[in-house]
């Protein structure tokens, strides 16, 4: 614990210094748990990113319906995550730094009675300081992280001994949690939160003119992947003239660079952020929070991060929308679902612009069948209501009065 305290103190100093230099004083107050709190006892729910929070939404909504007596407070590591939670009508704050005195202030101010963390967000001061049960949903523990934990000696076992319920997102993670010290009676069902994704029933007038059978999406792309996507689009379009590309970069701030790249290849670009109609060669989806719209508009989806050494992004959301899936070789973040998809012929692996173009053309006549197969294959084995029933039972048993 001494080593962890030293490292977190150094990290906190860096974070606080950046906030002060950037004059982000509102963020600074939030990171120190100095902001206003709402009255009453709370269940503290933490999700690191927008993606984790969005994946948790079915669980959150089911929890709000099943347990109206439980007031929620949500924390995230980004202001966009906070804004997303607030748009759902939830009190949300930037996550407090994991320093003992800061965590104690947050727990006291919000009168926290239990803590529910998403995925790998296992912070020692939160886990050890929470007065009630600590639950983990969608826990992920890679082999690399499990090895790193050993650097902290007995801290990992102290933390895991305080976990009252943990639902791992895959069997490998569960085995590693148990080997690291998770009590056997705390092991919940194996469920990937992202599998709970239920596509919203959305309509967008701007996209309604696109023919889904002749539209493909390069989703959550990273630098280098746009080059591949644009080159593949040019090659495939020569044989499928109606083909349209929606290009949705992981970081919309890179939009100007992507426009220049496309123009250099002789492609015209329409930008979503400027309200332009998707009648150009490429429709640049340079906005945040609208990926569900783009999944619904495309019959074929290339999943970004799989060619850029990023481990790949989620296959669950495009699969739930019934899209035929294409991915590169780096799928380590979702190794198990991609293996199932590939084995069933519900996804196609590529490694270059040439193989991406070939996949786009080969998948066109069977994209609907592939999309239906992907949707069926990744359908969750347990719904959000069943998970909430398990969580609620633990809260009823363990939460102090």
Task: Specify the residue positions occupied by each region the protein language model found.
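C-terminal alpha-helical cap of glycosyltransferases
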Residues: 380-401
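Conserved sugar-transfer catalytic core signal across GT-A, GT-B, and GT-C glycosyltransferases
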Residues: 126, 225, 290, 313-314, ...
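Acidic donor-binding loop of glycosyltransferase active sites
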Residues: 110-114, 279-310
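Charged active-site motifs of nucleotide-sugar-dependent glycosyltransferases
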Residues: 39-44, 211-216, 226-228, 242-244
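Donor-nucleotide binding loops and adjacent catalytic segments primarily
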Residues: 58, 62, 75-78, 224-291
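Catalytic binding pocket for nucleotide-activated donors in carbohydrate/polymer assembly enzymes
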Residues: 163, 296-368, 377
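Active-site and donor-binding regions of nucleotide-sugar-utilizing enzymes
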Residues: 19-32, 36-202, 221-223, 236-241, ...
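A transmembrane-helix-recognition feature enriched in membrane-embedded lipid enzymes
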Residues: 1-28
